Amino acid sequence: MLRVYHSNRLDVLEALMEFIVERERLDDPFEPEMILVQSTGMAQWLQMTLSQKFGIAANIDFPLPASFIWDMFVRVLPEIPKESAFNKQSMSWKLMTLLPQLLEREDFTLLRHYLTDDSDKRKLFQLSSKAADLFDQYLVYRPDWLAQWETGHLVEGLGEAQAWQAPLWKALVEYTHQLGQPRWHRANLYQRFIETLESATTCPPGLPSRVFICGISALPPVYLQALQALGKHIEIHLLFTNPCRYYWGDIKDPAYLAKLLTRQRRHSFEDRELPLFRDSENAGQLFNSDGEQDVGNPLLASWGKLGRDYIYLLSDLESSQELDAFVDVTPDNLLHNIQSDILELENRAVAGVNIEEFSRSDNKRPLDPLDSSITFHVCHSPQREVEVLHDRLLAMLEEDPTLTPRDIIVMVADIDSYSPFIQAVFGSAPADRYLPYAISDRRARQSHPVLEAFISLLSLPDSRFVSEDVLALLDVPVLAARFDITEEGLRYLRQWVNESGIRWGIDDDNVRELELPATGQHTWRFGLTRMLLGYAMESAQGEWQSVLPYDESSGLIAELVGHLASLLMQLNIWRRGLAQERPLEEWLPVCRDMLNAFFLPDAETEAAMTLIEQQWQAIIAEGLGAQYGDAVPLSLLRDELAQRLDQERISQRFLAGPVNICTLMPMRSIPFKVVCLLGMNDGVYPRQLAPLGFDLMSQKPKRGDRSRRDDDRYLFLEALISAQQKLYISYIGRSIQDNSERFPSVLVQELIDYIGQSHYLPGDEALNCDESEARVKAHLTCLHTRMPFDPQNYQPGERQSYAREWLPAASQAGKAHSEFVQPLPFTLPETVPLETLQRFWAHPVRAFFQMRLQVNFRTEDSEIPDTEPFILEGLSRYQINQQLLNALVEQDDAERLFRRFRAAGDLPYGAFGEIFWETQCQEMQQLADRVIACRQPGQSMEIDLACNGVQITGWLPQVQPDGLLRWRPSLLSVAQGMQLWLEHLVYCASGGNGESRLFLRKDGEWRFPPLAAEQALHYLSQLIEGYREGMSAPLLVLPESGGAWLKTCYDAQNDAMLDDDSTLQKARTKFLQAYEGNMMVRGEGDDIWYQRLWRQLTPETMEAIVEQSQRFLLPLFRFNQS
């Protein structure tokens, strides 16, 4: 007997199942109970509730509907295989074989054009998979189409795609028969199965004694027919969560309505019959001419299409008994009001049909201002949504001591996009406000890095082996462990790979395979050769076979190079081995071999690696089962594996005890005291999934067809019904960039509208309906602040935050932050090394952070370039020019230096490197000639100088008889001049009587004349004073910007500063040009040390820079004689 139990509470239906199991024991104690479910989460919940009732839940099978129906086919009908030859995966592989054979037919012209240029069979496999997916749906929802197609006939009224789908299906059936596989599939078994059961006078052997169907929102029509036929022989209890106690489906015709009017539902607890309609006499007025019911409740009408179709299909079953197990909902708060309206099929919304109704609001229901059973929260970002949720959950737990974390479920439209924010907020909360939580339904690929690493390894034949991509593999601990590379070792390797010139490509063969010219440099083989040479010899000994040894890879940590070489050897072996197409059976052991070659599993990764191997073997087994005989490229298997790992969801922690956080998915109507919905944004939910262009079902839909949009609408309805105490909804209602308004999901808006149209706040009785509706909406919707540290979040109320870490920022109460720069007392030491002064005056602001605060913002660049050098600029060019210039000045062999740079891979390849070198040689030679012309034998001068109460000590290198001579391969800059000025003052104060010169590129020069010792000490004393001030607070000396101002305002002929308006305006322009830079030249204001002091250059800051620059830089311009 098929019995359909209707109830608005899933827990009541589950209690009914417990009652039946306890009262009607199975004859065979070893026979398992059979409970059909649609998800593992529902199975887990049922196991938990059953174990609470009986103390144990064992010997229970939880099959999915499709597998259960096929199992029944196997048990009832002879010669039916345990697995269908027409499952989706098997059909995909068979279509891979069939499609190329059919493409020359006229019906397949469109597909023939699509499959051109498909050397790797990727398009063919994707098309086969999509077609197989469609056929799989047709087997369930359109079996009559397939029956006609098998006879060679077309179905009237279908789209153009039928022209190729019909012969393709027929060919698929015939090909399956040719393979020696049964031609049976679900479409041609339903009727045979039903007829066999209908004609059987006794129960066929092997059938279960009874079957429960629990928590399934909808079943396809053919499944219901099959279950009805089974119900003739066994007990089938279909437990349906029905949000409404009255019939709210459609009808076929007046006769169907007459049949419904004669039907009664028996109350499951009381011996009485209940009608299907509230008003049976006027039931005919509920339906239009097409048989569609004007559902009384607007929310049920909008969200319930899936359930409405299912109600219709259930009512169409002939031999079934319906039982009523509805539980009255006491309308004692807003949530229960809405649930009651849906249950009773009532519409309490007052839209103001006439002026009298519109003018007052007291014909609505009053809403308690303290009622928080339904709340709407508007946030600016997913991060704020989760932060607000965490605070609100803490408030709920504080308010209700009986509430526990396991009573709360949080559902998100896309759990993968919210997981990082959930882990950041929930996972980082301190112990005093930590909420235990469990995230379910994440994609398997995001659950463990091993999965993503394995997919990357399967891409080796197509890889360019970019340095960052290879090193990223070593970020996976179990892969690094396989090659004995620790986290510290990886830091060394990252530095070595960068400095040894590795950019991309395993070796020259790999480069040629990519149809690019091989250079012999910048590949992994080139870099490894440099590292291994560095272990054997020093770079000072010269290059070996045009390769320069890399010195850093020597010593005790040199074994790292060997480990890296082992990894690269394996990568190269597998790159070659995976490149060729193979028959499927030869691909079978590849997965296990690769896992063994690249990973050293631990307890945490064992499950992930098992999942990889299971899915790989399943793909291969399906293809072999379909007897696919052609060679298969790796890319096809890789894409299929990646897709399956994306679809695989990690759900084993659902209902584990903490706050349950999961995705909104079917059959999640498990009752919870608190139901929270996040990310309910317009355009995000209901989720959009456009049907395929050749999906004939979408072109001609029928009642009972599944639609992602209808499913999501019904999910929202189920979430509302399953909430027992509170329904919490949040969405991103404001832009985080400009605070502009964004809209919620249409489902949320419909709920808000219905509440506003059916409720009013006390005191609003005299307002018209629109005004009271607006006030209700404003009352229920809480707009949260953009930032968590806003002072509003720490006032009593629904926005109150528990996050103590933001309290110091919020307690400023809107006041501006105190100034970052606060003077620190600094006492000059008795002795100051000259090197310290030089370091300070090279960049006074940076020196304050580094030397005084011990703070360094300049982290080393961790990103390794992914291309070889084509041009050299910036630091690389300066470093080469520095060595080249010194070599030319010393009149060494520049050609030897060229060979050294080329052997290290520092130069562009081939003629480009030669051209670059020649250009630099010509420019540096001009500079070197100027230096050689003035150069004399020099010696180091010891400095021990008393000035301004301190002793300056150190050495001045290369002091010539006629003074100081310095050279740099850089352009003229004030910063370079300051360094020479400091040395010049020390030199003169120590008794030197020569001049100081600094030669720079493009005829740039700084030249200072001899100064008397007293005069030099005077200026040196100023610099020491500047050092003292700069170690107490940042000294705003910006040499280039301030120097540009001084250069414009200083009149060298009259030794005066010009301050007329015209000159000051020009000086300001020059200052800003140097500070801001342009497209070609980086401005001084981009310096991170200055940006830490101020976000924007204010007039006050600019005035301070000019003042300090004039104080310390003016002597440079006054004494410069270049």
UniProtKB/Swiss-Prot annotation:
Q: Which Gene3D superfamilies match?
A: 1.10.10.160, 1.10.10.990, 3.40.50.10930, P-loop containing nucleotide triphosphate hydrolases (3.40.50.300)
Q: What is the effect of changing Q38A?
A: Acts at variant Chi sequences
Indicate the impact reported for R142A.
Acts at variant Chi sequences
**Impact noted for substituting Q137A:** Acts at variant Chi sequences
- Pfam families the record matches: Exonuc_V_gamma (PF04257), RecC_C (PF17946)
Other facts noted in the record for this chain: In the RecBCD complex, RecB has a slow 3'-5' helicase, an exonuclease activity and loads RecA onto ssDNA, RecD has a fast 5'-3' helicase activity while RecC stimulates the ATPase and processivity of the RecB helicase and contributes to recognition of the Chi site.
Q: What is the protein's name according to its record? A: RecBCD enzyme subunit RecC
